[in-house]
């Protein structure tokens, strides 16, 4: 399969149809700015909802210059090991387990 190559054609990259006598889809241009001050434009369809943030080519996130600011994301507090333990056992059960383990350790030391 690697022997056969389509020469002179880039699949999916180029349209060989001319742009004459064709109306392009209506577009709107959204301008974004990154934290380091770089501004860039992204074309959207006229009826598309413009997002408040967009990832720039340099990898930084840009915010919309004109329009609604994005809503801050809700941050969930991190679940700790203790939180997960309390989901499975009550404090009374944990105290009982602690007593059992302490008795086992003490009996090993004696014997």
UniProtKB/Swiss-Prot annotation:
Region (Not required for interaction with SigB): 1-24
Inactivation phenotype: Essential for growth, it cannot be disrupted.
MF annotations from Gene Ontology: bacterial-type RNA polymerase core enzyme binding; bacterial-type RNA polymerase holo enzyme binding; nucleic acid binding
Biotechnology annotation for this entry: This protein is only found in actinomycetes; as it is essential in M.tuberculosis, it might make a potential drug target.
Cellular component annotations (GO), alphabetically ordered: peptidoglycan-based cell wall
Coiled coil: none
The keyword RNA-binding appears for this protein: no
Family from the record: Belongs to the RNA polymerase-binding protein RbpA family.
Protein name: RNA polymerase-binding protein RbpA
